[in-house]
């Protein structure tokens, strides 16, 4: 099985690079984005791309990774901010993915609504069940995505009131959208770095600088 990983930040990517070195993998580039690949002990292959922050970067890198490597699934991993019902240091898994900053309200649409049949996405059911069955402490929640770092109580309350979102990030819904269009099984797994409030910037930096390998360890543990 070939597992594709889409990762936004250098610090989030570094633990995967270290695993690549440990397993004797290779480093290269896909459409200008840094990528690494390695085989696990059980013969599964992990291919990871460093997409950069934000929805456009994530969407472009996801499409490039799928076209170049033809993985069996795509996993988006990294850090997120806690919105509701989840807390800093929790590991969360997306049960729905949507964009909180898409705004056509002058044209009569509600915030977040797109004039297309599908704009809220779900994870692949088999992948979701595999992760939640093996790791009982994972918390399922709604992932809301936008091209902004959420760091205010006002914005946080807006997201809660509008969607009841569990956590916020800057990539997952974009990756989900590309995977939906390309008929690629998708899942996002995140560790919560901050509370998406006025203290978020500082606590995010602290968490990011740790370069923790908990998420890639879970993936290797599951796929062997």
Regions found by a protein language model. Name each.
Residues 1-63:
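N-terminal short beta-loop-beta anion/metal-coordinating cradle
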Residues 46-52, 142-144, 189:
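Active-site-proximal beta-strand elements of phosphoester/diester hydrolases
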Residues 64-68, 84-86, 177-185:
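Alpha-helix C-terminal capping segments
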Residues 70-75:
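Proline-aspartate-enriched helix->loop->beta-strand connector
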Residues 80-163:
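Mid-sequence, gly/pro-rich, charge-dense loop/helix-turn segments that line enzyme active sites
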Residues 149-201:
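A C-terminal functional module that forms or caps the active site or interfaces directly
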Residues 196-224:
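His/Asp/Glu-rich mid-to-C-terminal helical/loop segments that flank catalytic regions of hydrolases
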């Amino acid at each position: 099985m070939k597992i594709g990983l889409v990762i936004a930040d250098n610090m989030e990517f570094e633990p995967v690079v270290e695993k690549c070195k440990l397993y004797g993998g290779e480093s290269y580039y896909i459409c200008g984005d840094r990528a690494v690949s390695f085989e696990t002990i059980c013969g599964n292959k992990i291919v990871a791309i460093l997409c950069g922050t934000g929805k456009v970067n994530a969407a472009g890198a996801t499409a490039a990774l799928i076209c170049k490597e033809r993985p069996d699934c795509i996993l988006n991993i990294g850090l997120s901010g806690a919105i509701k019902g989840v807390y800093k240091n929790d590991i969360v898994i997306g049960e729905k993915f949507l964009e909180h900053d898409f705004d056509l309200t002058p044209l009569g649409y509600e915030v977040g609504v797109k004039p297309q049949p599908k704009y809220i996405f779900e994870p692949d059911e088999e992948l979701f069940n595999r992760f939640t069955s093996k790791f009982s402490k994972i918390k399922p929640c709604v992932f809301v995505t936008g091209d902004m770092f959420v760091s205010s109580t006002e914005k946080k309350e807006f997201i809660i009131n509008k969607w009841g979102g569990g956590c916020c990030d800057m990539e997952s819904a974009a990756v989900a959208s590309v995977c939906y269009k390309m008929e690629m099984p998708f899942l996002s797994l995140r560790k919560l770095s901050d509370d998406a409030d006025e203290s978020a910037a500082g606590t995010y930096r602290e968490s990011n600088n740790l370069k923790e390998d908990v998420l890639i360890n879970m993936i290797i543990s599951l796929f062997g």
